[in-house]
């Protein structure tokens, strides 16, 4: 159940929220939507699945569609979330936990950006998701960032901030007061102003 204010172009409710799109699935509790600003805030118990464009179900099932080599997605949870379609970003806030193919990540805030290009010449399914792009371009993690590799939990990275450039496949760790550090499987510690992980 939700309330809709057509005059002010807003909606909101306190019940469970479920949203499904080709690039993003969302479960949560309570929401506020501002259709003029193109934002949706989810108040609590947020769980999301973010797919790369190669894993878009609509593209797979259409005529001539092919299964991707690898189904690329991440799952994440947090206390609350803000979707800003105009800026093509999703922000998870509070007790964020991310599970992806090779590692777990925890942090205070995670911001996921979609690119502004339609890599396939006009991916309508991405446009209908409100992001108008072909996939995740950048991921920022802020506040008590911890990355733990799945294949060896003793390999960890600690930082105040992380920037992941998805197309380039790079992860950069930085610190405010304390340098970020990496702990190898052998227990060796590497620390520096900026670390590429």
Predicted regions and their residues:
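Mature-chain termini and adjacent capping regions
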Residues: 1-197
């Amino acid at each position: 159940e939700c309330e809709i204010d057509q005059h002010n172009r807003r909606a909101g409710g306190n019940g469970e929220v479920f949203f499904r799109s080709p690039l993003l699935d969302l479960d949560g509790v309570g929401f506020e939507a501002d259709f003029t600003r193109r934002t949706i805030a989810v108040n609590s118990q947020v769980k999301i699945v973010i797919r790369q464009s190669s894993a878009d179900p609509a593209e797979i099932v259409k005529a001539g569609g092919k299964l991707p080599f690898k189904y690329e997605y991440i799952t994440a949870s947090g206390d609350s979330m803000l979707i800003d379609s105009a800026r093509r970003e999703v922000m998870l806030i509070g007790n964020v936990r991310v599970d992806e193919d090779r590692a777990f990540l925890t942090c205070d805030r995670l911001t996921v950006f979609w690119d502004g290009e339609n890599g396939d010449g006009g991916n309508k399914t991405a446009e209908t998701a409100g992001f108008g792009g072909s996939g995740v371009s950048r991921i920022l993690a802020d506040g008590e960032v911890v990355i733990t590799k799945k294949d060896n939990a003793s390999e960890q990275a600690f930082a105040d901030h992380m920037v992941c450039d998805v197309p380039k496949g790079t992860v950069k760790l930085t610190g405010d007061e304390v340098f970020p550090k990496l702990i190898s499987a052998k227990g060796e510690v590497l620390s520096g102003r900026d670390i590429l992980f």
